[in-house]
Amino acid sequence: MYGRIGRMIAQPGQRDRLIETILGGIAEMPGCLSYVVARDPRDADTIWVTEVWDSPESHRASLQLPAVKSTIERAKPLIASFGEHHETEPAGGIGIEREVRK
């Protein structure tokens, strides 16, 4: 499995609009096991996006999907900047099957 955790900082006062734009644009994304958008309770303009994919290749391929490209274009004016970004190797959890290591 392949994971990503990233911080986005919305333009001042645009966090909820950014969240609506992102969530409204989520469509069928082959290989996406989990995609969660969360508000940062300590910063009124920050959101965190946590993704779990079956592989890095599925994530890269998703960026070429028309619905994803359209969502990115609609979200760009609402984003002030990007904060931290981390790649992870999810081992499992609620809603995600545990990875079996061989």
Regions found by a protein language model. Name each.
Residues 7-18:
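Short, surface-exposed ligand-recognition loops at beta-strand->loop->(often short) alpha-helix junctions
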